[in-house]
Every structure is written in C-alpha cells, then in structure tokens.
Amino acid sequence: MSSVGFEPDVQQKQHGGITGGFSLKYTCEKYFKTICSIYAEVNYAQVGWKEDILDIDNKPVIITDTKQAMAYSRTINYIQVPVFAHLAWGREERGLNIFVNAGPQFGFYLSDSKDTNFDVKNMPKTDNDRVSPVVAQDTMAIKNKLDYGIALGLGAEYSIPKVGHFLAEARYYYGLGNIYGASKRDYFGKSNYGQIVLKLSYLFDITRTKNVRRK
C-alpha cells in the first residue's frame, strides 16, 4: 500500500500494489544476545497514489454523463533495492527470532500507467463540485526517475535446520526524494512516497561457517 505526500495536498486513499523479488542475508556476528546481519533485496514494486475525489460534503463527485463517481489512480513501477542492518533476538539456527530491519532504500523507475474514468486533459461536467482544485498531478509526467529514502521493518523468522528460514515482516518506507520537481518554480513543493509493505520470505543457506555458539 502506498500514497504520495503532495504539497499542496491531494486527497487520497491507499494505493494497492505488489512487491516481490530476491533477498540476501549475511550474518556477521552475534553480540551478546543480538544476531547482527546485513540484509539486502532486489524487488519489483508497484507504488503510486489513488485519489479520493470528494465534494464539500465528503461525497463522491459524480460525472454527469455517466453517473459514475470520478476515479483516478497512478501506478508507478520500480526496481527497489533496500539495504538493511538486520538485528535479531532469539534462535538463529532452529526456532523463532524477532528482528528489526533499518536502512536506506533506492528505487529505479521503470514505467507508469493511469487508471481513470474521465479525460484528465478535458475535465467532464459533474453534478457536484470537487472540493480540491489540485489536479496538476493527473497530467504531469514523472520527473525524477531515481527514488530514495529510509525504511524500517519489524518481523519474525522461524528457522528449520536443512529446510530454511521463513520470514514475515511489516515494513514502512518514507521517501526522501520527490517524483516531481520541488523548486520555487514548480507546482508541487513536495511529492514523496509513503509505503507500507507486508512481506513473506523464504531463505536457504548458501554457505555456513561452523560456530558452536549458534542455537
């Protein structure tokens, strides 16, 4: 689920999309009870925004000709590369541990698409007026093709010897970059992503070092 923090504000609902790819974890050492690792991913991700087009009474704006509620969403496809410090507490080799992921994330733009029921360049006649006059985002092309920000995740890992590691995680990403220009000459002062990701992962051991302290 994702949205874009526009300034001036654009009313939105959460935009749904898929995130999936490959993960790699390198366990460095165990300090006291903390298992310290480096965790990286290469993911294909669909992010964007879904507009909540309402009138002054918080009711959907109805297109006169079709009698449909106005709808607009933009899906933007990225290759996302997060690199995390992975700190875990609990069992490393067999059983359950709880972990925290934190670190930077980079996104490389692939493409984008619109899903709408009206002509964004020629606004239709409506039965009621939309409360927000901000519509520039509907026709603007994505300017900045590199996205970057920070992510924080909380999850659990269950390990079974000779089978692998099963991970479940909830993660939040806050974009530090903007998808549109943000200078004084640009329309938007801010246009950064906020993304909530729920992930299930499976990891298997490629190589292991002998360590009698592991449990």
Report the location of each language-model feature:
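Extracellular/periplasm-exposed beta-strand and loop segments of Gram-negative cell-envelope proteins
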Residues: 1-15, 47-78, 109-147, 178-195
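Start-of-domain marker
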Residues: 1-39, 45
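Transmembrane beta-barrel architecture of outer-membrane proteins
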Residues: 15-21, 35-37, 76-82, 97-99, ...
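Residues on the lipid-exposed face of transmembrane beta-strands in outer-membrane beta-barrel proteins
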Residues: 20-28, 44, 81-87, 102-106, ...
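Short loop/turn motifs that connect adjacent beta-strands in outer-membrane beta-barrel proteins
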Residues: 29-36, 90-97, 160-165, 207-215
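Hydrophobic, well-structured mid-protein blocks that either form specific transmembrane helices
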Residues: 65-109
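Short conserved catalytic/interaction loops centered on acidic-Pro-aromatic/His motifs
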Residues: 96-99, 112-117, 163-167
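Predominantly the C-terminal beta-signal and adjacent terminal strand-loop region
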Residues: 142-143, 147, 155-215
